[in-house]
Every structure is written in C-alpha cells, then in structure tokens.
C-alpha cells in the first residue's frame, strides 16, 4: 500500500499484522514522519479516532529473529483487543547513518 502524503510517500507492505510472520512492513515514510507516526496514522485509518473508537493499551519495540517490530496492543470500541506487529527493520536501516 502506498499512501501519498505532503512530503513524500508512505510505503507499507506485508500482511495483516496479526503475527510477526505476517507483520505490516513500514518500508518508507515521508520526510519528517517517523515509523511510529506512520503506525499511529494507519491505526487511525483502520480503526477510527483514537480515544473514541479505540485506545492504545501498550506499545513496545521487540527484536525477534533478527528483525525489529513495533507492537501495538489496542482495545477496540466493542471491548475486543487486538495486537498488531509492524516490522520497522528496513525503515530503521534506511534512517541509520552510513557506515564508513
């Protein structure tokens, strides 16, 4: 999924994010938008307004099998809970300064 935003394109690939193996992959964000900012924007697009139709229970960064994931535990308006995995490995590598 590519979403055009003012200063570039948000590039997201992968699966539904229900497991690390099917993680939502943040490949690229527009200038000035962090991976976490992109993730929050996507959560709002999928679930609606934060604090109204969903709330964030917990967010953490985890390392699994050499990949880096942002995990979000959200509580939806009906009381159900959902955990989403965002793979930010490629984004972090893009943002890392070049090594000499």
Task: List PLM regions with ranges.
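Short, compact, well-ordered microdomains
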Residues: 57-100
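Low-complexity, intrinsically disordered/propeptide-like segments
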Residues: 6, 45-46, 79
């Amino acid at each position: 999924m590519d979403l055009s935003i003012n200063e570039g394109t948000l590039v997201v690939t992968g699966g539904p994010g229900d497991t690390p193996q099917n993680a939502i992959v943040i490949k690229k964000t527009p200038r000035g938008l962090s991976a976490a900012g992109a993730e929050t924007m996507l959560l709002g697009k999928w679930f609606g307004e934060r604090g109204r139709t969903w709330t964030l229970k917990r967010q953490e960064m985890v390392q699994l099998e050499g990949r880096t994931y942002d995990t979000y535990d959200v509580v939806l308006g009906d009381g159900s809970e959902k955990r989403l995995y965002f793979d930010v490995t490629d984004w972090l590598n893009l943002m890392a300064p070049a090594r000499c």
